[in-house]
Amino acid sequence: MLTKVQKRDGRQVDFDASKIKNAILKAFKSVDGEITPYAEQKAENIADYIEGYYEDEATATIEEIQDLVEKGLMSTRRKDVARAYITYRNQRTEEREKNTEIFKIVKEKLSASNVQNQNANVDEHSFGGRKGEASNEVNKYIALTEYMSPRARDNHINNRIYTHDLDSYVVGMHNCLSVPFDILLSDGFNTRQTDIRPASSINTAFQLVAVIFQLQSLQQFGGVSATHLDWTMVPYVRKSFVKHFCDAMEWVYDDCMDIRPQMEFYINSSIDLEKTDCPFYKENKKAYNYALKMTIKELNQAVEGMYHNLNTLQSRSGNQLPFTSINYGTCTLLEGRLVIKALLEGSIKGVGKLHRTPIFPCGIFQCMKGVNRKPGDPNYDLFQLALKSTSLRLYPNYANVDWSGNAGYDIHDPRTYFSTMGCRTANGFDINAEPGTNPQIKDGRGNICPVTIILPTLAMEANGDVDKFMEILDKAIADARDQLIERFDWICAQDPKSAQFMYENGTMLGYKPEEGIRSALKHGTLAIGQLGLAETLQILIGKDQTSPEGMELAKKIEQLFKDRCAEYKQKYKLNFGVYYTPAENLCYTAMKKFKDKYGIIPNVSDRDFFTNSIHVPVYKEISPFDKIDIESQLTGYSSAGCITYVELDGGVKNNIAALETLVNYAMDKDIPYFAINIPNDTCLDCGFTGEFNDHCPVCGSDNIQQLRRVTGYLTGNYKTAFNKGKQQEVEMRVKHGKGNI
């Protein structure tokens, strides 16, 4: 007689026949919709049969008992009930196996026994990293099994359409945001514990920039940016100047309070210090010179403080620094020029005792015709300083304010100038712009959520047939649309208290409490990204976009993306956009899945990574000008973000003119966002910076940091921070400048 049952975890419990009966009755009810006397009788008979099946006082496992239940049901005339029981049993087995697998993954993350460097900005060995990554795996599992539609889940699992940041899906977070610093610094803001007064000096303003970046980064999973920091900081440079001027005047007069109110007009004036006709400044030249000197000193210290804060204040799990970006370069007022100069000199100076290259913020110099690109332009000297910074620190990157894709911007409103959120994400024309506002305003808008279509998978499904591929791609783009709307609706369903800082302070444009958070989120973008165009072309025609035939097909593919996004934008009144995905981790994981299914295919899967979006493969021997020529034919199809970069060797640090030629060439070719990769190796013992391999040429140390660009951002030592695929990609990057500049 059966007396004990051994559970799956090894525990033994008393045999309970009622549990067998209940399981059998559930199977009958699932088929018949009710429990009949026949069902009750069969459940009783099978339970008695199992109890008496064993001799003496026996112990049976769960699996053995379930096998006997199946045998008993199959012996009846109700084979349909037997099938229902078997199906349910198999489903439960699959769920247990999934739970076992997720438990295994969580244990690996908690112990850091299988570090994969999915995010180069997260230290997976740290306490916070281990805890955060374990939590992320659980969140991803719940998103896939409980929240995503079956179609979206299948596309993700089958390496067709990747849903980004699954760990943030369930809680309904959005991706990234361009923060409206003009408003937050001038009006102050509230936090959960207190409220913050408006900035009263340039030092305070830069401190608050770091604070706001930190606070906003906790409301989302992506990057945060300032769209025109040079313009934003002008009033606070002036506030500091007025303070220092009055301090100087107090050394001359007993009381300066009578003149202070008369100077306040200058703070919000459109006329800068050099042109103001304020009589107090002209009549007190020594005080003026003192105030200007002290203001510049305060400004430099404030910028230095911001750089250090943004590289040390780790506010996310995993000891993660917020992904911060600052756009600047177009303000021609003296005060704005001082800000630009301080930002660039701070970048060149570096951070810490070894003056290391700042990882954050990502600096983005906004190139603008008539402002900073040519000799004689008012900010041309600052463009030269930006190039020097790029040669030494890789930052800044370069945004093209005159890009054709940003048509309609207001030359008098820097909020409408083209800017990016660092890696490449950008805000295009807002179809939901409020009446009377410019649809190109970037502040308070961001990318809500992205997906990425794995193009090589679709090419394999088409068996190399171009027409069939285009049909499959068209359906995949429609699927991507549906997945984005599905996630957008879920994000819009969240309580504003979930991101109280963002909604209470209006950091996201257009929030109206009576209409819910959709009123703000509708101004952001829904990005349809892509991965592996070069490999896709190889599958379809045996050539990539560096050939005329490859470029012709590439344009056809990108036109389909653009046309569909434009169509969806009008139909759904949501800002769908074509996105050239960074694919920091996806370039490797998508390739790994591809290889598992299709094996090694020459020029397609014979490496550990897919080529990002529409880029020329990194291993192609090509000049920087040719690379720009090729990619410039495709970047115009993207409205939600793209980047073009070239790879140069360390010798360019002594050839600023060559960098200027390249940047201007890219801008003239209508490249929206351009970056230059230059090796940046630092000895962490003596501080020497240059290009070297395993040992410092000065002190011989092997304590080396080899800094490389991972997407649009920089990160730490690529040999430890990047995943396997991205490491290989970095090592295969050819120098485009050899003999070409």
Give the residues covered by each predicted segment.
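Extended amphipathic alpha-helical segments enriched in small hydrophobics
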Residues: 528-537
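Long, highly charged low-complexity segments enriched in Glu/Asp and Lys/Arg with interspersed Ser/Thr
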Residues: 79-92, 670-672, 677-679, 720-741
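Short, mixed-charge aromatic SLiMs
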Residues: 46-52, 73, 553-567, 729-740
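Conserved catalytic cores of very large enzyme subunits
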Residues: 91-95, 102-522, 539, 543, ...
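Charged, amphipathic alpha-helical regulatory modules used
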Residues: 1-109, 728, 732-733
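A ubiquitous short alpha-helical element
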Residues: 7-12, 30-37, 55, 433, ...
